[in-house]
Amino acid sequence: TARKVEALIRRMPRGTFEFTDYIEDDVVTDIPIRLKVAMTVGDGHIHLDYTGSDVQVGSALNVPTGGRAHPFMAIALFNYFITKDPGIPLNAGVLRPIRMTLPVGSVVNPQFPAACGVRYATVLRIYDAVLGALARALPAEIPAASAGQGCMVALALPDLEATDDDLWLQRTPPTRGLDNPFARARHALSQIAVTARGFLA
């Protein structure tokens, strides 16, 4: 897998391509959250540098990466690779040629006790930022970043047959949704069991 990804990267133009995107606010304040990425394409590897992204925030929008290369920070690259070569297996090898700089104390590498329960809303905007950098590197293939989806669609339902206070939270992933007539609901939704005491799974 890594060799296939490296071969695709070698076909990309060399250089550093930057893009900055924003989340409108962090819910606690009305100050936008900046997400900045510099994508450097080298010989068979890509470096994503998130230096310049804002410091961790007081709301649950922080993305806990532990400072290591994390799949959440490169989803746009994964989608590009599997679009160019649909035969690439989706495993850890896809991430191996990708290096990352994730500044300590930033929204992309927060420190304890940072809240992070709504991190996927930030991940969606990170996707847009990396897509924007790709658009600058490959304007003939990637026309632009998306219009920006910074929210998750969730539906909470009580379990009427449960004997306790269990609740089912259904989250629609960004790759597929309920508007797809060919997708069955069980594929279109992720189920996460939660209770009033916190997340179970």
What label would you give each PLM region?
Residues T1-A201:
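Glycine/proline-enriched, intrinsically flexible loops and inter-domain linkers
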